């Protein structure tokens, strides 16, 4: 039996003025994110691009990289070529922005039609501002399903009066570690997170 809790280390790349963050903040229908991710327990590392289309569907594309390339993967041919072909931003304009670490539990139902991830002990450091932050009392749960099927977990959350809230770890980390960034549309979510932490 494998480890039940896995550790992840992620570094998001963006332009110096955080255009990918701003696109999310401004609710652009189509947007992208670029990150390097290390699956610490297996030693695997990837360059990953997340694309969200105007139908609110997110698709991820990735290629393997060396762990040693984590902090400057765009200096290497494979990642640079991949990003040039798949990302709608000039590669030379991209810099490491926000790094995060967290622990994850992954649960899959027997029919493999439902996948649940539980992220905890989330910490951030901003490579641009040098500031760091942590949300040790916050747990982010994400449910992915194949089609519109009944979900036992959704019923449990409904019974507990827990309503879904959309949140991006990149955007959360940016807001918490960059006091100069615009964050008007995230203030309500930040208040909600603070309220949750105070009630624990």
Sequence positions of predicted segments:
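Phosphate-end processing signature that detects enzymes handling 5′-triphosphorylated RNA
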Residues: 1-200
């Amino acid at each position: 039996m494998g480890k039940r809790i896995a550790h992840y280390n992620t570094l998001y790349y963006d332009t110096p003025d955080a255009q990918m963050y701003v696109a999310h903040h401004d609710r652009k229908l189509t947007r992208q994110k670029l990150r390097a991710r290390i699956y610490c327990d297996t030693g695997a590392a990837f360059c990953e691009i997340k694309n969200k289309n105007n139908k609110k569907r997110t698709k991820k594309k990735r290629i393997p990289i060396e762990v040693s390339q984590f902090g400057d993967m765009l200096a290497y041919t494979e990642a640079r070529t991949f990003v040039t072909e798949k990302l709608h931003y000039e590669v030379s304009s991209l810099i490491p922005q926000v790094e995060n670490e967290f622990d994850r539990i992954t649960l899959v139902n027997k029919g493999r039609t439902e996948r649940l991830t539980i992220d905890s002990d989330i910490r951030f450091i901003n490579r641009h501002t040098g500031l760091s932050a942590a949300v040790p009392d916050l747990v982010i749960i994400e449910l992915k399903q194949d089609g519109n099927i009944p979900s036992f977990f959704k019923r449990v959350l409904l019974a507990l009066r827990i309503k879904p809230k959309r949140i991006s770890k990149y955007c959360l980390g940016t807001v918490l570690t960059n006091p100069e960034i615009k964050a008007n549309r995230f203030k309500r979510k930040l208040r909600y997170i603070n309220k949750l932490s105070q009630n624990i």
